[in-house]
From Swiss-Prot:
Species of provenance: Brucella canis (strain ATCC 23365 / NCTC 10854 / RM-666)
Annotated compartments: Cytoplasm
GO molecular function, one term: magnesium ion binding
Protein name: Fructose-1,6-bisphosphatase class 1
Main location: cytoplasm
Cofactor: Mg(2+)
UniProt gene name: fbp
Length: 340
């Protein structure tokens, strides 16, 4: 018996009007005009969205094609690589080379992959963020950063030289958040047309938040100042902060980013006393940088606890960094604790 057929979509009760929104491709074409670097940037983003559309099909099939979480190797930092990690890397590299980018830095490769010799942009990407959630139905994502390729080491530039950045969140819908330096735009993949349609423009973070996203299990390993910040938040309205806080942790930076961009909040994944966590855990070039770019465009902030992420000059391709991002007011408050 066929349980799912080619039926018409569910009609929302009380809100059955279909949104006829501009596609991201059309927006990028208008933004790029005849500018060569902008055209190269637009083509790179389109390639990533094409890859995201293909990747989500594999994610949605779960274990049917095989085990997406099968361990197949390790990356440069000895992090375990799953089958879908490597498959995602191969997919995006193939599409970005075809789009004419100069080089690609991926979490799943030790060194940048060479592309078109005269390419104008370089793309740093985490092909599948949150792969620890593979097979669990929990959030996954793709996150990327686009730099000008006009220097010898495009991936060792500070984040303030980014041309564009974005992420794709694979959840109960496939959502895109991106910016080309003109505000944050949200879009959603229409599975029928295969196109991403813009749903919100000029997205802004709220001025205040009571939502925190962090891994509470590592609290005992945090610095004294950070432990004090967490303890004061846990005390809620009876403590020095004078209000209650909610705690969120999705186990995928893209998932937490997407929630914070919509609802507000503050995320932190900072350095702690555990071996291997002395400088934080997230990668500066293709995780912290694009998040910081988007946070800034949405009126928020992103730091490593003391320095703006976008001002940090990477020393290595896969350099790790502490990361705090979100609502500016709360980040400033955390910063006072961080330096204690």
């Amino acid at each position: 018996m066929t349980l799912v057929g080619n039926f018409s979509p569910l009609v929302l009760v009380g809100d059955s009007d279909r949104v006829e929104a501009e596609t991201v491709g059309a927006y990028l074409d208008g933004w790029a005009g005849h500018d060569k670097v902008r055209l190269a940037t637009a083509n790179a983003i389109k390639a990533i969205l094409s890859g995201a559309g293909r990747l989500v099909g594999s994610i949605a099939r779960g274990y049917l094609p095989g085990d997406p979480g099968k361990l197949v190797g390790v990356n440069s930092d000895q992090d375990q690589q799953k089958s879908i990690d490597v498959g995602s890397h191969n997919l995006f590299v193939e599409l970005l080379i075809a789009a004419g980018v100069a080089s690609i830095l991926s979490e799943e490769a030790d060194l940048p992959v060479a592309g078109k010799a005269d390419g104008l942009v370089a793309v740093a990407i985490d092909p599948l963020d949150g792969s620890g959630n593979v097979g669990l139905g929990a959030p996954l994502g793709t996150i990327f950063s686009i730099f000008p390729a006009d220097v010898e080491e495009p991936f060792l530039q500070p984040g303030n030289r980014q041309i564009a950045a974005g992420y794709v969140s694979y959840g109960n819908s496939v959502d895109l958040g991106f910016s080309v330096g003109e505000g944050v735009i949200f879009a959603t993949l229409d599975p029928v047309s295969g196109q991403f349609h813009i749903t919100r423009r000029n997205v802004k973070l709220p001025e205040r938040t009571s939502d925190l996203a962090f891994n509470a299990s590592v609290q005992r390993h945090l610095s004294a100042g950070m432990q004090a910040y967490v303890n004061d938040a846990f005390l809620g309205k009876d403590g020095p902060r004078g209000r209650n806080f909610n705690m969120r942790w999705l186990g995928a930076a893209v998932g937490d980013m997407h929630r914070i961009m919509q609802r507000g909040g503050l995320f932190f994944y900072v350095n702690d006393s555990r071996p291997g966590y002395e400088k934080g855990r997230l990668r500066l070039v293709y995780e912290a940088n694009p998040i910081a770019f988007l946070a800034r465009e949405a009126g928020g902030k992103a730091t490593d606890g003391s320095r703006p992420i976008l001002d940090i000059v990477p020393q290595t391709y896969h350099e790790r960094s502490a990361l705090v991002f979100g609502v500016a007011e709360e980040l400033d408050i955390l910063g006072e604790y961080f330096v204690k």
